[in-house]
Amino acid sequence: MVSSMKVEWYLDFVDLNYEPGRDELIVEYYFEPNGVSPEEAAGRIASESSIGTWTTLWKLPEMAKRSMAKVFYLEKHGEGYIAKIAYPLTLFEEGSLVQLFSAIAGNVFGMKALKNLRLLDFHPPYEYLRHFKGPQFGVKGIREFMGIKDRPLTATVPKPKMGWSVEEYAEIAYELWSGGIDLLKDDENFTSFPFNRFEERVKKLYRVRDRVEAETGETKEYLINITGPVNVMEKRAELVANEGGQYVMIDIVVAGWSALQYMREVTEDLGLAIHAHRAMHAAFTRNPKHGITMFALAKAARMIGVDQIHTGTAVGKMAGDYEEIKKINDFLLSKWEHIRPVFPVASGGLHPGLMPELIRLFGKDLVIQAGGGVMGHPDGPRAGAKALRDAIDAAIEGLDLEEKAKSSPELKKALDKWGYLKPK
């Protein structure tokens, strides 16, 4: 029994002298209290995300007592505070990102005692991490099946992102692949429509891919968007595998962790890599005071097992500064127990003139996706694709783009149009 007449017990979850055990999961939060002390606010986070309710209870089971989260670090940070909380693994189901996020990123975001709350990072111990497979291929595996050893992979999306018939899409794909693009990608909302059915597109595009591979001697792939209800995604993945595809693309945020974990199993059986699009992430990653960081999102996606994921560019049109993106990319490429490294994808407002700076900032282990910066070339998509490849080759070789453009009319026209513009 809890022999106390006190109503609230949030401070029972705060112990700044506590030393976390090696098998506890650590979560870092930024928060701003609303009418309560920082200690109480931190305790409320720990309580709500572990075993708590708003009041003291008549009885606590022994397991509940041992499962209480503990705030062990609390420091002022700007207008708010940083808290680090240790969670016993008894709180978490093995191998379930869904259950983990329901705890550490669930009801805590709705508490009135907090003006803002942001999940900055989480640190799973090996005892928890070992239940996750991570990527099936990762950077090394993708480089092997693509046959690309020492340069960034190139990707593009036919623009406009919607409105293409299957025949029109196939014609554009032929031009893009022939010009030097490695990966043709559907955009996030391009799935299956009366004017372009998935089943027709998948068959047509892989026939075009096979033709281009025979003509160029290069491996080409199609990041086809299979996103939909889980049963539909599974059927679409099977179609891709039957047509000889190597990749599927999933909008992982809108699909959700449960769907992604299921499709990780499906794609392993089918031998398919997962390209993770992050559409909708900014709804909770963009506000620096509230939500979940892109870093935490990328970490969770790596645990489940995506092979490549969009992270930003720092030089293009999408929000995200260099330090944030570099931190994410470095983590995705780092050694992490048995979990393979993941290819970061740079996309959004890229064109050939930005390649030297992009590669200088983030290195060669990168998928570079340029949509408008390829499709908007004055001489068409094939020329745009070649201009991008030539710009990347120049950057890898340490050549000035203006010098490279002397032997590449496609690159010269791209530079004449966009120069070194950074879109806003």
UniProtKB/Swiss-Prot annotation:
The gene is rbcL. It catalyses: 2 (2R)-3-phosphoglycerate + 2 H(+) = D-ribulose 1,5-bisphosphate + CO2 + H2O; D-ribulose 1,5-bisphosphate + O2 = 2-phosphoglycolate + (2R)-3-phosphoglycerate + 2 H(+). Pfam families: RuBisCO_large, RuBisCO_large_N. This is Ribulose bisphosphate carboxylase. The keyword Metal-binding applies. It comes from the Archaea. Binds 1 Mg(2+) ion per subunit. The modification N6-carboxylysine is found at residue 185. The active site is at 159 (proton acceptor), 277 (proton acceptor). GO terms for molecular function: magnesium ion binding; oxidoreductase activity; ribulose-bisphosphate carboxylase activity. Homodimer or homodecamer. In contrast to form I RuBisCO, the form III RuBisCO is composed solely of large subunits. One of its GO terms (biological process) is carbon fixation. Mg(2+) binds at residues 185, 187-188. Its EC number is 4.1.1.39. Because the Archaea possessing a type III RuBisCO are all anaerobic, it is most likely that only the carboxylase activity of RuBisCO, and not the competitive oxygenase activity (by which RuBP reacts with O(2) to form one molecule of 3-phosphoglycerate and one molecule of 2-phosphoglycolate), is biologically relevant in these strains. The record marks 317 as: Transition state stabilizer. Its cofactor is Mg(2+). Substrate binds at residues 161, 278, 310, 347-349, 369-372.
